[in-house]
């Protein structure tokens, strides 16, 4: 696919976006990057054309709290066929299992395991078993309470999905969390696919176990590849978005991977990283 040939640096555009982008930042970044033109994409997103130098841009943007991305000119969303998204702390602004744990009074313990898992310190399947075991005895109705009262979409999620659907992309959420939430998110956002783990329930209460094979890092990639093949798409036509170490395999199976407010290990391996703006900031990476 032409969008992913190896390019000379002078062929790249530099995308700058943030909560508040100052003119002086744009002028300085254009100088640092050797860009010859600055154009506004949206209110706080800008394209610096023909950027030929990268070395000083990351440190400047980190200090100024700006997102940056070196992108190939003229790559359009319609060149892609599928966007695959993690759910917790990506499509959603919460960790759903942590919120269930809060009702059980074990949020601190579960959240600690969650964070260690996202940093890659614990194998996902084992961490999910540990966290789910702490939920034993929770009333099944607590899941609906969490969905109704605590689930929040990440900023820009609906705008991003609307634009991607308009461009012809299929949409999929793949989660190491629970299908109670992914099924409802799929319906709410009119997604094409949703895959997640299933909690075991007996007599209206969680048993502390997960049914079937756990969807973790490898499982996410397997699901993505299966759907990609069913759709007749190439790897280069896939966009994957995630935040934790268990998303890395899924992201590696995509042509473009985006680390969204992600752990350092994920940012280091992703095609692009978004740290300051919402999910709709992803749209500004394409023309």
Please give the residue ranges for each predicted region.
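Non-catalytic pre-domain segments flanking phosphatase-related domains
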Residues: 1-85
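C-terminal cap/substrate-recognition subdomain and adjoining C-terminal extension
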Residues: 2-6, 142-256, 260-287
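Residue-level marker of motif borders
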Residues: 81-83, 115, 238
């Amino acid at each position: 696919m032409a969008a992913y040939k190896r390019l000379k640096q002078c062929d790249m555009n530099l995308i700058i976006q943030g909560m508040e982008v100052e003119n002086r930042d744009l002028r300085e970044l254009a100088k640092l990057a050797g860009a010859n033109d600055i154009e506004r994409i949206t209110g706080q997103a800008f394209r610096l054309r023909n950027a030929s130098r990268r070395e000083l841009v990351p440190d400047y943007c980190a200090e100024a709290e700006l997102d940056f991305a070196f992108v190939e000119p003229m790559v359009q969303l319609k060149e892609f066929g599928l966007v695959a998204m993690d759910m917790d702390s990506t499509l959603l602004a919460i960790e759903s299992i942590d919120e269930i744990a809060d009702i059980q009074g074990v949020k601190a313990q579960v959240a600690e395991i969650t964070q260690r898992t996202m940093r890659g310190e614990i194998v996902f399947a084992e961490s999910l078993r540990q966290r789910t075991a702490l939920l034993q005895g929770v009333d099944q109705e607590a899941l609906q309470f969490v969905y109704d009262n605590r689930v929040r979409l990440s900023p820009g999620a609906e705008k991003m999905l609307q634009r991607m659907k308009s461009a012809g992309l299929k949409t999929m959420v793949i989660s190491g969390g629970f299908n109670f939430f992914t099924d409802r998110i799929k319906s709410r956002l009119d997604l094409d696919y949703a895959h997640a783990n299933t909690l075991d329930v007996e007599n209206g209460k969680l048993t502390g176990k997960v049914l079937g094979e756990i969807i973790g890092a490898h499982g996410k990639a397997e699901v993505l590849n299966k759907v990609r093949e069913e759709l007749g798409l190439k790897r280069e036509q896939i966009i994957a978005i995630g935040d934790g170490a268990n998303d890395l395999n899924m992201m590696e199976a995509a042509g473009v991977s985006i680390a969204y407010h992600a752990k350092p290990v994920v940012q280091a391996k992703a095609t692009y990283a978004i740290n300051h703006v919402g999910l709709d900031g992803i749209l500004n990476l394409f023309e």
